[in-house]
C-alpha cells in the first residue's frame, strides 16, 4: 500500500476529511487539526506508514465523546484511534466506548526502563496512553497593544486597562478556572471552590464582566486567526497553536503563561474499531521515546515520557530552543493549574448545561 497521506488530507491542509468509511487496512486517526495534527503527521504518521506500508486517513474533530459514543452505540464505528483530553478518556472508558490498554505492550525507554515507569505519573489511564502535556493559555498581538502589555490572568478580564474583544473557547472547561483565578482564587484552591454552588456562581459572575466582549471559538485553529484578523485583542488558546503562529509564521503573538491550565492528551482506541490491531501498533509506535521527542520539535507540547525530554532539541527553524516553550518549563508553571480530570468527568454535563443556558441568557 502507498506510504503517503491520503490526497484528501493534503488537499485540505490537514482539514476534516470526508466522512466516508475507511477502506480495509486504512487506519483512521482522529485529532484536533492544524499545527497539532501536522506535528503528529510528521512525527508519528509518516514514519509509521513508511515502516508498515499502511495508509492513514487523518480526520479532525473538536473534542468531546459525543461522536465516539454515537459510532459505538450505533454499531457503525469508522474511527480507529482518537486523540482525547484526559477527562474524556476517563468518561469514554467508564462508558465502555474505548478499549482497555495494557501498559505492558508499550515500548520501553531506550535504557530498558519499562514504559509504566518512564511515563510521567498520571499520564497512563486504564484506556488511554498520553502523548503530550499541553496548556490553555491566553495570548495577545503585540502590534495591537501600546504601552503596558498583559502579564496576568487578571489582565485578560480587565476591559478598562486593555479594551477590546476577547476570544474564549465555547465551553465551561478552563473558562471557569480562568474566571476564579482572575477573581483572586489561588491556583491550588480552584477546584475546591468550583465544586461548590457558590464557587460556580462566583465564576459565572466573573465571566459576566466580559461576556459582551467575547468572541467564542471552537476549533483550535481559530484563536491565532482571530488575532491575525484583528477580531480580538487577546484570546485563550492552546499554547502550541500560538507558538506555531509566532515561530513558524512570524506572527507578533505573545503568550501569557500566568494562570495557564495544563492538561494531557491521550490516544484511545474505539470499541469495535475496524482496524484494532493496526491501531494498537500505531499507538505503540507513536508513544515511543523518540516519536514523542520528534513531535516536540514541531510544536511546543511537552512529551509524556521522561526519557523523551533530553532528546527534545530545536524547533524546525533550527534557532528556537523548545525547552522554554513547553508548558512544563519552571518559569511557566509559577501560577499554573493542572486540569482536574476527575472534577470534569463528574461535572462536565451539568456545567455544560449551565454554560449553555448562560450563553443563551
Where are these regions (language model features)?
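Extracytoplasmic ligand-binding site segments that recognize negatively charged/polar headgroups
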Residues: 34-39, 84-224, 228
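A ligand-binding cleft/hinge motif common to bilobed small-molecule-binding domains
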Residues: 89-91, 234-251
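Periplasmic-binding protein-like
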Residues: 200-209, 247-273, 316-317
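Mature extracytoplasmic/periplasmic domains
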Residues: 270-335
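Conserved C-terminal helix/tail region of periplasmic/extracytoplasmic solute-binding proteins
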Residues: 331-361
Amino acid at each position: 500500500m502507498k506510504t503517503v497521506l491520503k490526497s484528501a488530507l493534503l488537499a485540505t491542509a490537514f482539514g476534516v476529511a470526508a466522512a466516508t468509511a475507511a477502506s480495509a487496512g486504512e487506519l483512521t486517526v482522529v485529532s484536533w487539526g492544524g499545527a497539532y495534527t501536522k506535528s503528529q503527521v510528521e512525527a508519528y504518521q509518516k514514519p509509521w506508514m513508511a515502516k508498515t506500508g499502511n495508509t492513514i486517513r487523518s480526520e479532525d474533530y473538536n473534542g468531546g465523546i459525543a461522536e465516539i459514543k454515537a459510532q459505538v452505540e450505533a454499531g457503525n464505528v469508522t474511527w480507529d484511534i482518537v486523540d482525547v483530553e484526559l477527562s474524556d478518556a476517563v468518561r469514554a472508558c467508564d462508558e465502555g466506548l474505548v478499549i482497555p490498554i495494557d501498559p505492558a505492550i508499550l515500548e520501553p525507554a531506550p535504557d530498558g526502563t519499562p514504559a509504566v515507569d518512564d511515563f510521567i505519573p498520571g499520564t497512563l489511564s486504564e484506556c488511554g496512553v498520553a502523548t503530550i502535556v499541553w496548556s490553555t493559555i491566553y495570548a495577545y498581538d503585540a502590534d495591537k497593544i501600546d504601552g503596558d502589555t498583559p502579564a496576568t490572568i487578571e489582565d485578560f478580564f480587565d476591559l478598562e486597562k486593555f479594551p477590546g474583544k476577547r476570544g474564549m473557547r465555547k465551553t465551561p472547561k478552563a473558562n471557569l478556572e480562568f474566571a476564579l483565578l482572575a477573581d483572586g482564587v489561588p491556583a491550588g484552591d480552584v477546584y475546591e471552590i468550583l465544586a461548590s454552588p457558590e464557587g460556580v456562581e462566583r465564576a459565572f459572575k466573573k465571566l459576566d464582566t466580559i461576556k459582551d466582549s467575547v468572541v467564542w471559538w471552537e476549533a483550535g485553529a481559530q484563536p491565532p486567526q482571530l488575532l491575525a484578523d484583528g477580531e480580538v485583542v487577546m484570546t485563550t488558546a492552546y499554547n502550541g497553536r500560538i507558538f506555531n503562529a509566532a515561530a513558524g509564521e512570524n506572527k507578533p503573538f505573545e503568550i501569557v503563561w500566568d494562570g495557564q491550565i495544563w492538561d494531557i492528551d491521550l490516544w484511545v482506541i474505539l470499541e469495535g474499531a475496524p482496524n484494532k490491531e493496526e491501531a494498537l501498533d500505531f499507538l505503540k509506535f507513536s508513544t515511543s521515546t523518540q516519536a514523542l521527542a520528534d513531535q516536540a520539535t514541531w510544536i511546543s507540547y511537552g512529551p509524556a515520557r521522561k526519557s523523551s525530554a533530553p532528546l527534545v532539541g530545536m524547533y524546525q527553524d533550527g534557532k528556537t530552543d523548545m525547552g522554554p516553550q513547553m508548558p512544563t518549563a519552571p518559569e511557566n508553571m509559577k501560577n499554573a493549574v493542572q486540569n482536574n480530570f476527575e472534577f470534569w468527568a463528574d461535572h462536565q454535563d451539568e456545567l455544560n448545561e449551565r454554560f449553555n443556558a448562560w450563553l443563551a441568557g
